[in-house]
Structures are given as structure tokens and as C-alpha cells.
């Protein structure tokens, strides 16, 4: 059950809420939203996890009174993407680390932004860093594996310990469906190997969930070979 927040008494002459990121996040916290589970942009607030964020319709109405110009995005698809991504990031991110971000990658920006509050990380686009974001998506990961097999190179499944992979188990279809719905530029596959793509398209028809299974099998075989 939501509490109805009267925030008028919380503001003084020296405590007006402006349009800065700091003020918006402070206001959200005051009305009971857990900002570790939302992604902030100046124009939109994206809910990553509705339950954990506690960003109810009542709290949204309170928020919109203060910030009518900021849209609250409740996309269930985006929440599913965040859930998939968090399974990787929870294991890969080191608290308080500096993370080098890719340029012009809107979906990665959205996924990584909450970790500045969850783990105290600093997102950088140049200069010194501890970890680097690899924007590898699930489709390219699978196509890389198939390409290596077809070329006789083996699994071609490698990951760098200094890299993190927020999109490694998120499909191109999910990503572009969300980006299109949100009015953003779509992304493309990096791996354009024709044989790998054709085989992936064939498997799409007969076993739509194959991608996760291919990656899981490759991880198992890689670990097995490393221990022998």
C-alpha cells in the first residue's frame, strides 16, 4: 500500500528542487522510489524493476507534479532486458571501479547508469579505467561460436576478465524492439558471417530458444577443456 507524500513541507528557500540529475534523484528518493532500480536520463526515467524500484502509479503522479516534463517509461520489455543483463553484471562489476563505456550506445548507457548507485561505479568515456564495457549481444556471441566451428577453429568463445558484457545474453530482437518503441536508433549485428547467420536463421525456425543453450553449452565445454 502506497503512502501519499506531501512534499511541500520538505522544501525550504534553500532546498528547492531543480532540474539537475542530483535533484531529480533526491526527489525520487524522498517520495519512496529506490533509484538503484531506475535508469535516469534528463528526458525520461526508465523503470528497471517495478517491484524493487517501488515506483508505483501513486508515486509517479507525485513525481509528475514536480517534474511534468520528465516521462516515466514502464516498458515490460526493458525490464526483461534489465533482468537478463543484471545476471552478467552482478558477477562482473567491481564496486567503486571506473568503467570505460562505448560511445553512442543508448541501450548500454541505460543499463549501466543505475550501477553508479548500486555499486558506486564511475562511468567514463576516456582516460583511466578499471573495466571496459564490451557491447557484444547474444546474437553475435552465438554467430561467433558458429563461425569458429564452421572454420575449424573450435568454439571461438573467449571473454576478457577486464571486460563486462551487459548485452551478452540479450537478443537483437529484444534490443531493437525496445529501441524502436522508444524512438531510438536501432543497432545491427557485428558478425556478418553468412554461413553463421544462415544457420542461426534456420535454428530460429525450429528451436527459437537455441541461443541461450548454445552459449551455455560452449561455456560448459570451455570450462571442461580448461580443467583437463
In which residue ranges do the predicted regions lie?
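Short secondary-structure transition/capping segments
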Residues: 82, 124-129, 204-216, 226
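A short, terminal or domain-edge coil/loop segment
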Residues: 142-147, 212-213, 217-220
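C-terminal catalytic and target-recognition region of SAM-dependent MTase-like enzymes
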Residues: 220-228
Amino acid at each position: 500500500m502506497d503512502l501519499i507524500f506531501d512534499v511541500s513541507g520538505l522544501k525550504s528557500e534553500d532546498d528547492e528542487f531543480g532540474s539537475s540529475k542530483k535533484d531529480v534523484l533526491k526527489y525520487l528518493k524522498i517520495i519512496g522510489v529506490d533509484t538503484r532500480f531506475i535508469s535516469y536520463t534528463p528526458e525520461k526515467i526508465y523503470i528497471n524493476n517495478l517491484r524493487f524500484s517501488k515506483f508505483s502509479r501513486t508515486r509517479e503522479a507525485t513525481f509528475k507534479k514536480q517534474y511534468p516534463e520528465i516521462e516515466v517509461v514502464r516498458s515490460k520489455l526493458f525490464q526483461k532486458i534489465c533482468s537478463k543483463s543484471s545476471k552478467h553484471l552482478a558477477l562482473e562489476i567491481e564496486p567503486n571501479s571506473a568503467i570505460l563505456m562505448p560511445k553512442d550506445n543508448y541501450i548500454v548507457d541505460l543499463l549501466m547508469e543505475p550501477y553508479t548507485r548500486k555499486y558506486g561505479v564511475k562511468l567514463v568515456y576516456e582516460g583511466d579505467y578499471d573495466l571496459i564495457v564490451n557491447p557484444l549481444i547474444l546474437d553475435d556471441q552465438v554467430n561467433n561460436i558458429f563461425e569458429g566451428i564452421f572454420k575449424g577453429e573450435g568454439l571461438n568463445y573467449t571473454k576478457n576478465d577486464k571486460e563486462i558484457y551487459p548485452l551478452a545474453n540479450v537478443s537483437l530482437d529484444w534490443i531493437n524492439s525496445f529501441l524502436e518503441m522508444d524512438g531510438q536508433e536501432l543497432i545491427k549485428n557485428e558478425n556478418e558471417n553468412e554461413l553463421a547467420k544462415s544457420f542461426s536463421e534456420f535454428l530460429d525456425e525450429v528451436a527459437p530458444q537455441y541461443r541461450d543453450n548454445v552459449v551455455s553449452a560452449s561455456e560448459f565445454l570451455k570450462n571442461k577443456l580448461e580443467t583437463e
